[in-house]
């Protein structure tokens, strides 16, 4: 449209975290990768009678993300629930209890969606209909942001705790 645009990129190829690059004959996705089920990697290697440790090393991160808000407040997001509560308390003490409740509720969602239903084929409408009561109980009709907001009052914390759909190209305000 005739706009004069300058692209600034750290890497030799464009795309930032979403770039694709080639190295040693392989094509890599340079995007953010979160491995939430490392046991599945082990299962894949076992199918080929191989050991993952012979090919890769997974290193758990102490800090998963660091958020820096407009007011320069920093938050180190991690899997350490106690540390998360301490940081939440610094931003809004009232949200610590809401965070505990949110974590407990999302564990139920994970148990249903990943643990119980991950291997269930939804190849017939009846199979999906059987899950309708559980989907309603787990508030699957709410967006991620809306669900988080029902437990968390502080806007910074709401945005931070709603960001996960972004990792797979989703919108926290519309993704359920």
Q: Can you say where each PLM-predicted feature lies in the sequence?
A:
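N-terminal glycine-rich phosphate/pyrophosphate-binding loop and immediately adjacent elements
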Residues: 1-108
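Rossmann-like flavin
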Residues: 70-175
